[in-house]
Structure formats: structure tokens, C-alpha cells
């Protein structure tokens, strides 16, 4: 399927679909924990970004990413875009930060998406957030390289210097009760 075909299909579709290298993939529903974590991140970022050109988006706005001989369209769980000229109605092309909340069924895919996302020169931070335990993995652009950092304590603070924000793991996981059974 071509890009224009996908965009027309997706606009009329009742369910969300991602577009990768010409293939269309249906998006599965998410758990309660996934939704709470995504909302916690988006709400806190929205509050911190007031008065700046940056805006936080959640789940239903696509991110267009470059790919070999094509483009991909993903639905990040939370995305922050700061370029006012990046204003397509249904997607953003130049996110500064992308968050993916991991689930057992999507973890490998979300980790793999980073290979595509990192081709976007606007992206400064790619953040993977576990919903099983307090754990955040941050990929941070440093020139031509990417630096990795992991946070595992709820008192830890995630510095999002690219957008002038900070999130503690306590804020990210507010309302989540972790159990050994998960």
C-alpha cells in the first residue's frame, strides 16, 4: 500500500493502524496501567510546556518518520513537538521527544521503532517506559551518537532538557500499584 492510500484508509478507519515500509498493522488496545502511565506523562508535560512553542500529544496523533525509500507512520503513546511549522492535522514530522509505554506484546516492536525514529534529526529523546515495574530507558541524542540511561527508582528524575521539562518516576507511575504477579 502506498502512503497516500494508507492516509486515506486511516482517515476513514475506526481502528488505528501503523504504516511500516509499505505494510499496514492494526494497533491493539492497551491496558489500564498503560493508559494511566501515558496520561500521567502527557498531563504533566502539558502543564510544564504551557507558554512554550512545544505541545504534548497522546496516542491518536501519528508521527511520520523517514525510512529507506519510504516513510513510516507510528502512533507514539506520547509525543512532544516544538516546531510551529510542523502542523499537519493528523501527524507530526519533527517530534523533539517520543515516549512509548511498553507492554509484553509491543516491547520488541517499540524497541525496534527506535531504529527508524533515530533517523529523524529533530528527535532528541526516545523514552521507553515499563508498565510492569518502575523502569525507564532513555535514548538521548548527543550529536551523531545516542546515549543510553536507565532509571529504576521512583525518586529518580527524568531530565528532558530538549524541551525544558523534568518528570519523576513517581509522577509517571502515579496511581499504579506494582505487584509481583504482573
Segments predicted by a language model, with ranges:
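Gly/Pro/Ser/Thr-rich low-complexity, intrinsically disordered segments predominantly at protein N-termini
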Residues: 1-182
Amino acid at each position: 500500500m502506498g502512503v497516500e492510500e494508507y492516509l486515506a484508509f486511516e482517515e476513514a478507519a475506526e481502528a488505528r493502524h501503523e504504516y511500516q515500509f509499505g505494510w499496514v498493522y492494526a494497533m491493539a488496545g492497551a491496558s489500564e496501567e498503560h493508559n494511566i502511565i501515558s496520561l500521567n506523562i502527557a498531563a504533566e508535560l502539558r502543564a510544564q510546556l504551557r507558554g512554550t512553542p512545544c505541545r504534548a500529544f497522546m496516542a491518536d496523533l501519528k508521527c511520520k518518520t523517514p525510512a529507506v525509500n519510504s516513510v513510516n507512520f507510528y502512533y507514539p503513546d506520547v509525543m512532544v513537538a516544538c516546531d510551529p511549522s510542523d502542523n499537519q492535522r493528523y501527524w507530526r514530522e519533527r517530534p523533539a521527544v517520543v515516549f512509548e509505554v511498553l507492554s509484553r506484546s509491543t516491547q520488541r516492536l517499540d524497541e525496534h521503532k527506535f531504529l527508524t525514529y533515530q533517523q529523524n534529526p529533530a528527535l532528541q529523546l526516545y523514552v521507553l517506559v515499563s508498565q510492569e515495574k518502575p523502569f525507564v530507558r532513555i535514548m538521548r541524542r548527543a550529536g551523531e551518537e545516542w546515549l543510553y540511561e536507565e532509571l529504576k527508582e521512583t525518586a529518580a528524575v527524568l531530565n528532558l532538557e530538549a524541551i525544558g521539562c523534568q518528570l519523576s518516576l513517581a509522577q509517571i507511575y502515579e496511581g499504579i500499584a506494582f505487584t509481583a504477579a504482573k
